[in-house]
């Protein structure tokens, strides 16, 4: 081969691995494929930052951008820094690009594919609607440009499309049927790399350093008591190994159990944000748990076991992928149509932790500060917002969780909100979490409340969950006057919960009637269509009736 031909071959020999989720080196089929073959003489590991995800939003109710609270932004940036460090140890690096045209991630990737003469593009498959539309643009460009594309499924244990195909073209609608169809997941890639191909010439492209969250203009966040959970693959593997070190705990793990008030040492693994960003491979995690199960005489089983939680995750991914309009009530054939209310006073009180119910408010403050709370705490505040007390649309709560949770996941977040509002999957709407007695079962002294609501730190434990019942003399001694230093309850739980049950019963009856209509189940192509509030019924709002002790 002459020198010109050799140079031409070298110029064409380039592969790109496009990171989106899957921010890891271990068990990463896209990275593994990109480093192999003739096109891997040079490897371009790319992540594209969308400015809209980071840009400060002064109108947002808490620090961060319109799309993400400061805790999740920080977790992402830490994950990118860690990925870059791990790639550098292998002789590579992360190429961080800024999206062109204010959010055109696909256009930015396509431009790099052309300018860097990429012959093979590898990226992890993503089933979210936004990602499907984005990836189609890139794949169409690649096809037209003669670029090979490899997009493996590795964010979940199973391929949702394959599960749906095995189920006759429909997603399985119960966990049990999903598990029966799924079987055992593929084995993870266990190879550990000693090096990766070098990065090729990037020309005149501006390669960004990973910014620090303090540099993004979110204002003074020093007092925000930011999350204890550091992002990145290194922390994910460390946390997983620490969780699995206690084999007896792993074998006996049962999801319904656990203390939602435990915050300094949470009662769960807190691996969900690492799975969400792909810092931890779900298949590798599953494989490690199974190794422990094989070494123990007895262990719990799905749905309550640790592996059962990973299967729940895949279940929601599969149902979400196979259900049009999964992220809204209208046009969603699996979601009950309920006349939820709109209330411009009650919703901000819930969102900002100002309901006057310390258990609810402490949870929402933990969410804002840490971006995480125990699953039973999530159940409490979701029930309170929707079918328990305020009867406000689950989509409103979903949006708050979507912005603030560091483990916010499109399929799981929407699925859980439909579940907890009794809109789908779970229908025992009469079972309501008490905003006063539920937390007390786990934390009678109210330590969780005292931590996140310091104004209540000196309230006697007899009144910590219902401070409005404390005599004025006790309130003065605790330096917390209800209605002045801490709000009065926005609703009377005893009254509001009865009204909610009544409205849920009426809505269920209406849905049964609608089942007989011939046009039942038609889909809407609109995205997150908002409900009209004109004919909706509002439970007791800020004009609260005289309060009784809640059950």
UniProtKB/Swiss-Prot annotation:
FAD binds at residues 255, 268-272, 309-313, 372-375, 378, 407-409, 413. Residues 374-379 are annotated as: Interaction with DNA. Residues 508-551 are annotated as: Disordered. Phosphate binds at residue 254. Its cofactor is FAD. GO terms for molecular function: deoxyribodipyrimidine photo-lyase activity; DNA (6-4) photolyase activity; DNA binding; FAD binding. Residues 512-522 have a biased composition (Basic and acidic residues). Pfam families: DNA_photolyase (PF00875), FAD_binding_7 (PF03441). The record marks 340, 394, 417 as: Electron transfer via tryptophanyl radical. InterPro entries: Crypto/Photolyase_FAD-like_sf, Crypto/Photolyase_N_sf, Cryptochr/Photolyase_FAD-bd, Cryptochrome/DNA_photolyase_1, DNA_photolyase_N, Rossmann-like_a/b/a_fold. It catalyses: (6-4) photoproduct (in DNA) = 2 pyrimidine residues (in DNA). PROSITE patterns: PHR_CRY_ALPHA_BETA. Binds 1 FAD per subunit. It comes from the Eukaryota. The keyword Repressor does not apply. Its EC number is 4.1.99.13. Residues 533-544 have a biased composition (Polar residues). GO terms for cellular component: cytoplasm; nucleus. Gene3D superfamilies: 1.25.40.80, DNA Cyclobutane Dipyrimidine Photolyase, subunit A, domain 3, HUPs. Involved in repair of UV radiation-induced DNA damage. Catalyzes the photoreactivation of pyrimidine [6-4] pyrimidone photoproduct (6-4 products). Belongs to the DNA photolyase class-1 family. This is (6-4)DNA photolyase.
């Amino acid at each position: 081969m002459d020198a010109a031909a050799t140079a031409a071959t070298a110029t064409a020999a380039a592969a790109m691995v496009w990171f989106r989720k899957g921010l890891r080196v271990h068990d990463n089929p896209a990275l593994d494929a990109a480093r192999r073959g003739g096109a891997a003489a040079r490897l371009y590991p790319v992540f594209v930052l969308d400015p809209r995800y980071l840009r400060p939003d002064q109108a947002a109710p808490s620090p961060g951008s319109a799309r993400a609270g400061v805790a999740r932004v920080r977790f992402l940036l830490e994950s990118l820094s860690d990925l870059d460090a791990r790639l550098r140890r292998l002789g590579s690096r992360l190429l961080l690009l800024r999206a062109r045209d204010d959010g055109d991630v696909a256009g930015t990737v396509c431009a790099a594919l052309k300018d860097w003469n990429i012959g093979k593009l590898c990226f992890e498959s993503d089933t979210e609607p936004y990602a499907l539309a984005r990836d189609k643009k890139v794949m169409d460009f690649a096809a037209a440009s003669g670029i090979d594309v490899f997009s493996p499924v590795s964010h979940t244990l199973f391929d949702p499309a394959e599960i749906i195909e095995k189920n006759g073209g429909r997603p399985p609608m119960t966990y049990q049927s999903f598990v029966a169809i799924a079987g055992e997941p593929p084995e993870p890639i266990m190879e550990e790399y000693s090096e990766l191909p070098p990065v090729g010439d990037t020309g005149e492209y501006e390669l960004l350093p990973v910014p620090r969250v303090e540099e993004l203009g979110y204002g003074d966040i020093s007092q925000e008591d930011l999350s204890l959970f550091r992002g990145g693959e290194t922390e994910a593997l460390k946390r997983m190994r620490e969780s699995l070190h206690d084999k007896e705990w792993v074998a006996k793990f049962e999801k319904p159990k656990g203390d939602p008030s435990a915050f300094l040492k949470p009662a769960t693994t807190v691996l969900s944000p690492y799975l969400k960003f792909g810092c931890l491979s779900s298949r590798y995690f599953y494989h490690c748990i199974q190794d422990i199960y094989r070494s123990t005489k007895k262990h719990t089983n799905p749905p309550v076991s640790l592996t059962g939680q990973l299967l729940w995750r895949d279940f929601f991914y599969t149902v979400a992928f196979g259900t049009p309009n999964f992220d809204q009530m209208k046009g969603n054939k699996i979601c009950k149509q309920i006349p939820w209310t709109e209330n411009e006073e009650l919703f901000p009180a819930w969102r900002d932790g100002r309901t006057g119910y310390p258990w609810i408010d402490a949870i929402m403050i933990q969410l804002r500060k840490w971006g995480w709370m125990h699953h039973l705490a999530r159940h409490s505040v979701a029930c309170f917002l929707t079918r328990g007390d305020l009867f406000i649309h689950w989509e409103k709560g979903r949006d708050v969780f979507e912005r603030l949770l560091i483990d916010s996941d499109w399929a799981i977040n929407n699925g859980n909100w439909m579940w907890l509002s009794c809109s789908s999957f779970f229908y025992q709407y009469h079972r309501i979490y008490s905003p006063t007695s539920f937390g007390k079962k786990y934390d009678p002294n109210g330590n969780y409340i005292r931590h996140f609501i310091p104004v209540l730190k000196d309230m006697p434990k007899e009144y910590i969950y219902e401070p409005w019942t404390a005599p004025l003399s006790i309130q003065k001694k605790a330096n917390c006057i209800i209605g002045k230093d801490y709000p009065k309850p926005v609703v009377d739980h005893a009254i509001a919960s009865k009204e909610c049950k009544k409205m849920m019963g009426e809505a269920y009856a209406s849905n049964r009637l609608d089942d007989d209509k011939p046009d039942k189940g038609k889909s809407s192509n609109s995205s997150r269509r908002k409900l009209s509030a004109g004919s909706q019924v509002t439970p007791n709002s800020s004009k609260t009736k005289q309060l009784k002790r809640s059950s």
